Each structure stands twice: as structure tokens, then as C-alpha cells.
């Protein structure tokens, strides 16, 4: 694992800088695109999420769910071409009413970063997230300190004995518990916590994506 980090460190740090740039330079529309990507990725894959965003990008701000479904089906981009667009539009409607789509300002309104993640994961009108994808979204817009405990990361942690089971955590309490175990593990092996998440993911997928 340390050797993998050493071999991919340059690529991983480049990717993390790209995430930082999304927050420093990106518009609210860009932040919304990243959130939509994470909604598409949930229950699917990172690659499927990327392909889906590419297929519906012109529709993300104003398109309806039916138009998104047509675009996804035409591109063969997603396994849930009807449900995911409904999640996207429903969540977009919520953000319009909650903050006028001013996502940067809304995210900055939280003094506690964990309260911010709790809001994304627990707000019922934010569809299709949960703690993993809320963490994924925050990481992808440059927020540090949140673990993305997907199946790849969980399998790696189980294989090296950090956790007993590779089953993804299903509650907030369990998510925070595993996250703390990952933080301690990163400290023990001398690898930056945010970099380690991408190391583990790349060990199972063979690439450093997002």
C-alpha cells in the first residue's frame, strides 16, 4: 500500500489539486455538476457517473427528467436512466428553494464541516446521496478530511485487517467509526489521509479517477 502510494503519489496529488481548483475557481453551476455526478455514481460506478454527466450536461441546470432520460438512454450511459434524472431534478428543485442554487454560499454557511456533510447526507430532499456520496462530493470540490467508504475502499481495509467486514457502513455512527479507523491507519503507515483514499480506490480499480 505504501509502495502503491509512492508509485502513484504524483498522479494522486495532481488529482487532489484539480479538486481544490473546483472550489477555488468553479461556479455554482460547476459545483452542481459535481453533485449531479455523485448522484449518478451512487449505486453505479465512477465511470458511469462521468458518462452520465457528459450525456446530460446541457440539461443539468434547466432540463426536465424526461429529457435527461432520453439523453441517458441514447448514450447508453446509466443503468438507471429513469430514476437518476428524477433524483437530479428533485434535488435541483430543493436547492432552488433552499438557496437559489447558490451552492457555494450554502456550503460556506456551515462552520462545522461534519454538520455540512450531515446536511447533504440526511436532508430528505437531497436525493440519492448518503454519507459515502456526500463525502465523495465534498472531496471532489476540494474539501479535505472525509473518507469515501465505497466497496473498493472497504475491501482494501478488510484485506489488511483494519476493519472486520467489507460491508459498507449503513448508519452515520458506523460510517464515522470506520472513518476514524481509516484516519488512524493513515497515520500509522505515514500516508496523508486524503491521498490514502485514492490509493485504496486505485488499488482495486487500476486508475486514479474521481
What is each stretch, according to the model?
Residues 1-78, 84:
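Structure-specific DNA junction-binding interface
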Residues 1-22, 85, 100-118, 123-210:
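C-terminal accessory module of base-excision DNA glycosylases/AP lyases that mediates lesion recognition
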Residues 34-43, 89-93, 139, 198-205:
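Short, hydrophobic/amphipathic alpha-helical patches that form generic packing surfaces
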Residues 40-48, 60-61, 96, 145, ...:
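Short alpha-helix boundary/capping elements
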Residues 53, 92, 179-183:
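A generic structural signal for ordered secondary structure
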Residues 55-126:
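Alpha-helical ds-nucleic-acid-binding substructure associated with the helix-hairpin-helix region
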